[in-house]
Amino acid sequence: MSTPELSLPAHLLPADGRFGCGPSKIRPDQLAAIDPEVMGTSHRKPAVKNLVGSVREGLSTLFSLPEGYEIVLSVGGATAFWDAATFGLIERHSAHLTFGEFSTKFAKSAAGAPWLDAPSIVEAPAGTVPDVGDLSAEADVVAWAHNETSTGAMAEVTRPHPRNDQQLVVVDATSGAGGLPVNIADTDVYYFSPQKCFASDGGLWLAAMSPAALERIERINASERYIPNFLNLQTAVDNSRKNQTYNTPAIATLL
């Protein structure tokens, strides 16, 4: 049986072709706010550090961060974060919900790491969402997307095994953060790039991290595991606490 071709009528098409699961259109007010006094400035200078500090403070307020949680940021977007988490957040074994292109990518990163055990994967067809409760109780990291960018399918954010205090809940919120309700206390790492709901540009990752996640990062960093400097989460934490990034950030994205 042949598949019929679907065609949307012109009045239903978005006025701007950038509408979709890609980056959001940036508001004119934000484009006008690009400050020549900040653009092209060293990220070690007060002007940029103050900007980073204001972003961290604003996100802390937006998400009503519980005591001990911190906003951490670095360069490279959520794609870089998957590799950074593979190096510096997963201790031995992770479990993943995969239900689209983006939730699958973190699982692939973990599967390719020879220093980790093979990840447990709970898969569901694109457009549907697997059950968070099916994630392994033995995994030291459980991971999924709050909103699967490629399909729009939304998963709940909750701790699947709350009695396991060694299990970190790591949620990709790139196309959900700022637009979907969340209790950050139900996560240990709620990470995202800002080019969706925040209508910024790409190039950075930001994350709300729990004390347990911060402790895990510090412990793995102190071990004998090799971690590239660019992907070192402890480096990101240390710099964020100084309102900096390890290397030059996309300043326009922060603005």
Task: Outline where the language-model segments fall.
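Conserved active-site segment immediately N-terminal to the catalytic lysine
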Residues: 184-195, 205
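Conserved PLP-anchoring active-site segment centered on the Schiff-base-forming lysine
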Residues: 89-104
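Active-site phosphate-binding strand-loop segment of PLP-dependent enzymes
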Residues: 124-178
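Active-site C-terminal subdomain of aminotransferase-like
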Residues: 25, 197-255
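N-terminal "arm"/small-domain region of PLP-dependent enzymes with the aminotransferase-like
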Residues: 1-43
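Structural motif
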Residues: 95, 140-145, 170, 191, ...
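Conserved N-terminal alpha-helix of the aminotransferase class I/II PLP-enzyme fold
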Residues: 34-84, 101, 105-109
